[in-house]
């Protein structure tokens, strides 16, 4: 008996009582044969205003062509996106994290309302990645991700530069390290075309995580946006989704607990973004896999950092593709017993089977260190707790900035206040910069603090100050930084009670973050604290404040 592959779409296309549905589909130039084909949603996060996303509509057309060669019906649709790089440092960043959930909601909505049988999702930027994955997990229909791909490095006066070079150029100009002319040249040459920000920033981090999970094709996370290989990946979409339909392999068959452990190992080895903690937790929730921040610490305790990628290192993701790409790194880890090779993937094969014929990394490569010569012996993503963060926080400590920092609090109630302080020389060596009321509810939307960290690095203070916040950090942030402090200031967390001059210790060896205050002093400050007014009184951010939970 022939297997039914259009088990969802036939609800509309083969039911005589759905004549109006069929009339509208005929109106889209579908014919009689098309009515019996499985319908594949091709969900792109295309829009023109961002290098990460501007080419995705073209990739979606390549995918549609591939799907229809397999006697399937491709149905392209779009969802929204927010460019963190463009909105960074402005109130627009409040919309970034909530865009992840809007993307997931909108893909789920279109797929469910139109009864599509499978999904090929094409994200390009930071929050696109988990948003698409959350939708796939909720729907649990055959589907996978095609990453839009990484950007090529920019070149200025013979040296490679990227988006973080552009972010840091303002601080460098303020401190006299570069001229205004050099700053202008930097920002014009940092982004040479289509593709996601090139270092191990959030989009590339999540692309690695998705490939390690088995939810994208091998090499998807390391091929460049404008490469022939990316087009070839799109050309494989039809046979891949048809195979998933025929084998009835669904996201929840792939996104298992062991697969998430693979993802956590890979992003640790790669030196990935702190945002991976938030996003992997949300992705796991979408498929009912029990994952907590403590699981990240367990992985960090036994997993080294091996990759020398920007922002703290030398290389961009395009450099990795030239020496074998993400699969070559995973093959090394599999050989070392650090990955679960028996996990199923969207190829219909196991992870180990996918990696069987992948070439080893070149012995003399300088991008991925050997296991016996790590950049850091344990993971860079450290979960810190203490009286500053009783419910936890996420630190990004590569080891290059040290592992313990003691200093005095320099407190700011917004990102803007801190930026103004740097501009006027009010941030000094030995400061623990505190930026608060930037959490999920207080921000709102938990904006990323890339502008402050870039100013710090650009001003040459990267080794001399620490920054803690109830907001987030971009994958482009580096230095001695601790984010996701919970409870957040808006809800009366300890970070709301800190004052200028308080002595703060950040210890990434023992995983603690404490302020030197007695319980009596803390209780006294707490009694005087009053909740601040919501920053959003209408619209989507008001809804977000009402529904979002603690980081």
UniProtKB/Swiss-Prot annotation:
Its EC number is 4.2.1.9. NCBIfam families: ilvD, PRK00911.1. Belongs to the IlvD/Edd family. Pathway: Amino-acid biosynthesis; L-isoleucine biosynthesis; L-isoleucine from 2-oxobutanoate: step 3/4; Amino-acid biosynthesis; L-valine biosynthesis; L-valine from pyruvate: step 3/4. This is Dihydroxy-acid dehydratase. Binds 1 [2Fe-2S] cluster per subunit. This cluster acts as a Lewis acid cofactor. Keywords: 2Fe-2S, Amino-acid biosynthesis, Branched-chain amino acid biosynthesis, Iron, Iron-sulfur, Lyase, Magnesium, Metal-binding. It comes from the Bacteria.
